């Protein structure tokens, strides 16, 4: 294979479905793992060089960070679905208009998020009853990342466009470059310049900005130019991006709000449980990467084949891709159960914290198999243009199941010795919600209403 062939967009409407899905997933999985290294390296450097309280500060800020970035999630998903379907349908003009409108929408959204982040970070942390011992660190970390959010926004959205075109290799390479920069800057800013959590935040902002520039350069060489006619907002494209992306943005917002609410419960258990939750979520980020990668691959695969009117091929790929994802997550579950203690020891030298984290991680382990089903089949539905069904499923499992279950179990397990209840309920509620999400996703996939949502042919600009 020549370099030109390696970096060419992948046509997923031909060839064996499982081979196309796996070939697309592998570089994306490596890229997602590298992206998770951003947060993991932050945690390791903070935990080793600053201390457990600083580690807890970064963890307490994360749910709010995710909540404020949901606009970008929506734009990314909406653009990715449109790009994959227009690419599959060979509609070049519509493809360029979609990308241009996406670039402009991202610029507007970045300005909004910068302002909201700078103004709301401290009040939100206070509302969540963040301990006084870590609130200043939390605020510093959040404000820096919010003010510098444009790089992160453009990187994630432009990567989504590249993947919609079938190019997961470029996204991988640019992310690896940024990850190396992030790791180096983390170590320099924290261990050499003693900048604490602020140093970690600055390192992340710089690295993601470099990634965004590289992605933009790739798109310019590949398919897109910056002539004003493409960057000018056009209602039919911008509204379609919002229509398709809004449900995913709402889904992420609901999940992030739930995380914020559950973080308030987590904070009530003290710094040790907060720090344990940070470590668990870092390991969880890696464990979930194959599921997210398969889900994104299935979105691109389904989008291109729906655009090409190959629904039989969509269903064939959905079955094969989901089975591979389930097998991968089963392996991960076994590794967590066997080696969980060693994994937690990477993040901290505190024996009690390692033991606590490892025991709680075992509660979650089997849930990754359920999430393999949810992510793969939700990806198929999104790729076909049905972004509403995954949103409603997420709302039910998060708002109706996870949050009430966490608080309800905490209340029911209160004793004079444990006035806030048992901390284990934090992860038990998550496991139950994951399993219910898989069941609901499977039911709605089988119903098949998602097959009627194709975009191509309805929004062409002749």
Sequence positions of predicted segments:
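Helix-terminus/linker motif at the lipid-water interface of multi-pass membrane proteins
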Residues: 33, 37-56, 125-132, 188-195, ...
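Transmembrane helical elements of multi-pass membrane transporters/channels
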Residues: 23-42, 144, 178, 207-211, ...
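Short alpha-helical transmembrane segments in multi-pass integral membrane proteins
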Residues: 1-25, 83-148, 192-246, 302-367, ...
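N-terminal transmembrane alpha-helices
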Residues: 12-50, 63-78, 82, 107-114, ...
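Small-residue-rich hydrophobic transmembrane alpha-helices
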Residues: 55-115, 152-171, 263, 276-340, ...
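Hydrophobic transmembrane alpha-helices of multi-pass small-molecule transporters
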Residues: 67-70, 182-186, 211-216, 286-289, ...
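Interfacial/gating helices of multi-pass transporter permease domains
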Residues: 46-66, 132-137, 197-198, 240-244, ...
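Short runs within selected transmembrane alpha-helices of multi-pass transporters and secretion channels
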Residues: 76, 144-163, 171-179, 200-215, ...
């Amino acid at each position: 294979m020549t370099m030109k062939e390696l970096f060419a967009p992948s046509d997923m409407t031909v060839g064996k479905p499982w081979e196309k899905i796996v070939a697309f997933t592998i570089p994306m999985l490596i890229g997602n793992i590298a992206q998770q290294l951003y947060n993991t390296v932050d945690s390791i450097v903070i935990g080793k060089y600053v201390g457990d309280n600083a580690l807890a500060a970064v963890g307490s800020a994360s749910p709010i960070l995710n909540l404020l970035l949901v606009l970008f999630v929506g734009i990314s998903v909406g653009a990715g679905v449109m790009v994959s379907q227009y690419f599959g349908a060979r509609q070049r003009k519509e493809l360029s208009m979609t990308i241009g409108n996406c670039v402009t929408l991202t610029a507007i959204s970045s300005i909004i998020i910068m302002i909201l982040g700078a103004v709301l970070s401290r009040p939100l942390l206070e509302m969540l009853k963040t301990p006084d011992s870590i609130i200043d660190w939390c605020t510093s970390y959040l404000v820096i990342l919010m003010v510098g959010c444009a790089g992160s926004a453009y990187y994630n959205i432009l990567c989504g466009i590249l993947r919609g075109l079938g190019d997961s290799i470029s996204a991988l390479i640019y992310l690896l470059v940024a990850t190396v920069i992030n790791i180096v800057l983390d170590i320099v800013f924290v261990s050499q310049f003693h900048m604490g959590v602020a140093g970690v935040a600055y390192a992340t902002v710089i690295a993601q900005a470099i990634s965004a520039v590289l992605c933009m350069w790739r798109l310019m060489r590949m398919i897109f130019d910056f002539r004003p006619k493409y960057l000018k907002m056009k209602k039919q494209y911008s509204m379609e991006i919002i229509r398709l992306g809004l449900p995913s943005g709402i889904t992420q917002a609901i999940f992030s709000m739930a995380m914020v609410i559950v973080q308030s419960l987590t904070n009530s258990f003290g710094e040790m449980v907060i720090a344990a939750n940070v470590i668990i979520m870092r390991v969880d980020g890696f464990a979930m990467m194959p599921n997210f990668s398969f889900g994104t691959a299935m979105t691109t695969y389904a989008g291109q084949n729906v655009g090409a009117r190959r629904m039989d091929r969509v269903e064939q790929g959905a079955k094969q891709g989901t089975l591979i994802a389930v097998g991968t997550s089963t392996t991960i579950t076994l590794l967590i159960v066997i080696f969980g203690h060693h994994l937690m020891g990477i993040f901290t030298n505190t024996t009690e914290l390692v033991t606590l984290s490892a025991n709680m991680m075992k509660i979650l382990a089997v849930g990754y198999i359920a999430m393999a089903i949810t992510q793969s089949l939700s990806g198929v539905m999104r790729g076909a243009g049905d972004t509403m069904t995954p949103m409603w499923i997420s709302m039910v499992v998060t708002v109706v199941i996870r949050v009430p279950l966490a608080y309800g179990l905490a209340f029911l397990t209160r004793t004079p010795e444990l006035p806030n209840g048992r901390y284990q309920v934090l992860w038990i509620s998550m496991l139950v919600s994951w399993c219910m999400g898989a069941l609901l996703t499977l039911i709605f996939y089988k119903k098949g209403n998602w097959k009627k949502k194709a975009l191509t042919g309805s929004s062409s600009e002749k």
